[in-house]
């Protein structure tokens, strides 16, 4: 028995027995985590079972597995596939006639990281849609262009909705006091033709004033871009980060007019950084908005324009495979905020 447990799970008998008590030893968890990072399938299966626990330990293990699955934590090259396949097996067990009403399987019947990972591994479209319904519930598009249909949840070319982008970026802001991020908006109201960015700026200034780094996420119709107001040498600057084709002049002018409300006096003080980064990240504009907020929150006193331009230039030097991996992992990291 001792040899079997040690060879399967890298644990001693006492450490293995501790997994079935309320308090699992940190030593046993550390050994399991290390084995899972290296792709040990037996340990992955064991941790996925532990992640079913609806207590602090279960949530900690579930988070660890999702961090590996989403690329936040480094593991073996195929770690995401091993984890989501293990979750899929658990999901199949959770839905058989014996266990489907068992509360111990709750995480596989309600929105959770485990259910999301199981859904990503499902190839049966009807089952995939069924899982997506459990995760998303009923969602409504904020604009005509938003794709909120459940069949698109794991699609690598799905446009992020306002709610997803808001959940993820607000989650980032909680981790960094350097940025203020506003709820995503459309630039122009579809019926009244009102400049919504201007309205949001006026409301923000009236309520609390602009912070030193104020972010607005703006949809121009079918595309997200990042609008940042910041101070440099005591002067207010405006930076537009656009990861697709250059904006048309009408759109640029609407942004410039809104920027004047924030104190921008000259149009040349609105800096448009425009590079097409989306060849291998289809409909990835929202992903880049999220990622650039991450960059800005860690940039300290560095000039935001320099930070974002360097990122864009470096991204274009990545291989097709590296850009595709960015697409997959960033989508997973973003959706995690909607599961919390």
Swiss-Prot record:
Active site: 223, 285
Pfam families from the UniProt entry: ElaD-SseL-like_C (PF22102), ElaD_SseL-like_N (PF22103)
Top class in the EC scheme: hydrolase
Presence of the UniProt keyword Hydrolase in the record: yes
Listed GO biological process terms: proteolysis
Disulfide bonds: none
UniProtKB keywords: Host cytoplasm, Hydrolase, Protease, Secreted, Thiol protease, Virulence
Induction or repression: Expression of the gene is induced inside phagocytic cells and is dependent on the SsrA/SsrB system. Highly expressed in host macrophages and when grown in an acidic environment.
Lineage: superkingdom: Bacteria
Record-linked InterPro entries: ElaD/SseL-like_N, SseL-like_C
Record's GO cellular component terms: extracellular region; host cell cytoplasm
Intracellular or extracellular location(s): Secreted; Host cytoplasm
EC code(s) of this entry: 3.4.22.-
MF GO annotations: cysteine-type peptidase activity
Function: Effector proteins function to alter host cell physiology and promote bacterial survival in host tissues. This protease targets the host cell ubiquitin pathway by acting as a deubiquitinase in infected host cells. Specifically hydrolyzes mono- and polyubiquitin substrates in vitro with a preference for 'Lys-63'-linked ubiquitin chains, suggesting that it interferes with a signaling pathway rather than inhibiting proteasomal-dependent degradation of its targets. Does not possess desumoylating activity.
Family: Belongs to the peptidase C79 family.
Protein name: Deubiquitinase SseL
